[in-house]
Amino acid sequence: MARLDRGPVSGAACDPDMSAIEVRSLSFTYPGADAAVLEGLDWSVPQGAFALLVGGTGSGKSTLLSLLKPEIAPTGEYAGELRVLGESVADMEVRASAERVGYVFQDPENQIVCETVWHEMAFGLENLGMSRDEMRRRVAETSYFFGLEDWLHRDTDTLSGGRKQLLSLAAVLALRPRVLLLDEPTSQLDPVAEKNFLHALFRVNRELGCTVVVAKHQPRPYATCAYRIEDGHVREVADMASLGRRESLFSDDMLGWGAVRCAKNGVFSRREDNLGSLEPPGDVSSAKKSSELDKSSEFVAQTSLENGSGAFPRTDGSRILQK
């Protein structure tokens, strides 16, 4: 079997001239609140990006992400326009949302609802009315991609925090979303589990062409771009890959962004010459090298030109395009 091509994924999913997320003049106020948590916010994320949404507690980053997912959108006074892959979130049906937008919570205990790993991965598929044969195929493909095939009959309660979060990610990806939103997904993980989770997330972005947006308190050097949100506005944007020393981009103080200002309007254009230079976060070989990372690296991912989605491998080595 051919080893995975680490070059940029082709196709619509990684088109830097198209937006995966488009937010215009967004304002949102929680019931009973004296002030809006988001006010006149403009924000755009290109397709295929690995983006960080960085801000402190109360900055509005979690609210912004949840508003892009109709099933979990908070109650409150809302104005403005939100679009995902060109479709208005306000008009998006639940099925379309499930198949377009994936969401991973900070705490996997808030996301895992089934007793076994297999049933957790099949839960969303069953809710969409998928046939049992198709569910089995999806679970097999996704578990193999993430290296979870040996976990399928394990009780979810027996998994470590890092494995639970990886399971949450895999269960979401079984639905084949094209945009993936994550709210502080590694804040409760130890350093080894965090590195393995980020490596899996990086593969989802690079190999499947999935646009990834991660909300974090502090910026990290592994992203394509970072957006700083403060007082309900996207204040600044950094093109992480175009700067020499990405490790020293930001100070611990969130006011230390002056040296990396690339744009003021919350719109980032991903430069094609930056794509090939990106590497997985950290030295993966120094992390706890689990069997899932070794096995899954043997497959070639392919992008569907019809819908811009990536491809999950079959367990026999052939590939299945996302539907």
Task: Annotate each predicted stretch with a short phrase.
Residues 176:
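Conserved catalytic motifs of ABC-family nucleotide-binding domains
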Residues 155-159, 163:
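Conserved ABC ATPase signature
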Residues 180-183:
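Catalytic Walker B motif of ABC-type/P-loop ATPase nucleotide-binding domains
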Residues 133-151:
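Conserved ABC ATPase "signature" region
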Residues 77-88, 97:
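Conserved ABC transporter NBD signature motif
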Residues 69:
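Helix-to-loop junction immediately C-terminal to a conserved catalytic motif
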Residues 17-23, 28-40, 72-75, 91-93, ...:
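A short, flexible loop at the N-terminus of ABC-type nucleotide-binding domains that lies
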